[in-house]
Amino acid sequence: FLFVAIATLSVKAQDIYMGGTVGLWRNDDANTTSFKLAPEIGYNLSEQWALGVELQFNHEYKEHISTNTFAIAPYARFSYYENKIVRLFIDGGFGFATTKVKDGGDAINGFEIGLKPGIAIKLNQHFSLVAKCGFLGYKDDYMNNSGFGFSASSEDLTFGFHYEF
C-alpha cells in the first residue's frame, strides 16, 4: 500500500493529458444516424513516450436497427518527431469492444492489436489539435471489422484535442 501511495504522489500533473473525439453523422437518404464519443487520458513518461487509454461509445441507427458499441483501447505512444508546433507520433496498442444490437441477440465481442499514426498541432501551452489516420494490424470482430491489413481511408480519420496540465 505504501508503494502505491508514494507512486501516486510522485505523478506530476504536468505530465498528464486529457482529451478525446466526438462525432455525429446523419444520412437522410439512407436513414442512418451515428454518434461517437471517445474520451482519452494519458501520461507522458518522457518527451518521446506516453501511455494512455481511450474509451469509446458508438451508437448507430440504420434501417430501423440500433447498435451500441463500447470499447477500451490502451496504448503506448512513441513521438518520433517534434518541433515547437508539430508532433508526429504512432500509437501501438490493443482494444477490446462489445457490440449489442438493441432488441437483438447476444453481444459480439472483439479485439484489435496494431499501430495508428497521428499528428498533434500545438495551439498554445496547454491545448493541441490531434488527428489520427490509418491502422496497421489485426482485428477480430472489432467494431464490425475482422482481418489483418492496412487501411488509411477517411473512415479511419479522427480529429480531437488534448489538454496537457
Short names for language-model regions:
Residues 148-159:
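Short glycine/proline-enriched turn or capping motifs at secondary-structure junctions
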Residues 15-16, 22-24, 35, 40-116, ...:
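Gram-negative (and chloroplast) outer-membrane scaffold detector with strong preference
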Residues 1-7:
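Sec-dependent N-terminal signal peptides
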Residues 8-13:
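Sec/Tat signal peptide C-region and signal peptidase I cleavage site
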Residues 132, 141-143, 148:
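Outer-membrane beta-barrel porins/channels
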